[in-house]
Regions:
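Short, flexible hinge/linker loops that cap or flank conserved catalytic cores
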Residues: 2-4, 130, 173
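N-terminal Rossmann-like FAD-binding beta1-loop-alpha1 element of flavoenzymes
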Residues: 6-34
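Nucleotide donor/acceptor-binding cores
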Residues: 7, 30, 134, 176-179
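Short amphipathic alpha-helical segments
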Residues: 22-24, 46-47, 148-152
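Glycine-rich FAD pyrophosphate-binding loop
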Residues: 26-50
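Glycine-rich active-site loop/strand segments that organize a redox cofactor
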Residues: 46-89
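Glycine-rich dinucleotide-binding loop and its adjacent helix/turn
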Residues: 69-76, 82, 86, 140-179
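Feature captures the FAD/FMN-dependent oxidoreductase FAD-binding
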Residues: 77-142
Length: 179
């Protein structure tokens, strides 16, 4: 027999939408588990760390509105916030509302199928866990999978390659390199 974890709701992704859903689903009394493929919260703001990354939406419009206290304690430093500031904000939200306790980091949902007999979703994760849930929320976002265009010779290129969706957290030194 396979052990199955069971939650009222499962959220896939811990970016801006996923964090919001974890908070709201908890607020209405549901047990929640979120699965995030990355090692931290933030979604696109976790993965896209390239130089100059910033939001094209004004900071006050890019803030959660479910908590007046949160809005009072967080002060954006720029009208159009940078990636590091947005990532700090989302980490602050995750800590402020203790959202991490319901997130399995470094875990993908590999399969989701609806079982009509049980009236539940049955999921398989990349950690070989089986999970059952009544409500399944996909919060993976439009930028969750990187797109690599077909470029002749890319597979034989011996130099370093960087994609904006997966830029190294420690940055890249281009000094004395031909780019």
């Amino acid at each position: 027999m396979i052990d199955t974890d069971e939650f009222d709701a499962v959220v896939i992704g811990a970016g801006i939408a996923g964090l919001y859903m974890i908070h709201r689903l908890r607020e209405i009394g549901l047990s929640v588990r979120a699965y995030e493929k990355g090692d931290g919260v933030g979604g696109t703001w976790y993965w896209n760390r390239y130089p100059g990354a910033r939001c094209d939406v004004q900071s006050w419009d890019y803030s959660y509105t479910f908590s007046e206290e949160l809005n009072q304690e967080w002060n954006w430093t720029e009208r159009y916030p940078t990636q590091p500031e947005i990532e700090r904000y989302l980490n602050h939200v995750a800590d402020r509302f203790d959202l991490r306790r319901d997130i399995d980091f470094g875990t993908r949902v590999d399969q989701a199928r609806f079982d009509e007999d049980q009236n539940k979703w049955i999921l398989r994760t990349s950690r070989d866990a089986t999970v059952a849930t009544r409500y399944l929320v996909s919060a993976v976002g439009a930028l969750s999978e990187r797109f690599v265009p077909k470029i002749n010779g890319i597979e034989t290129f011996a130099g370093e390659q960087y994609h904006t969706n997966g830029w190294p957290a420690e940055g890249v030194d281009f000094e004395n390199k031909r780019v």
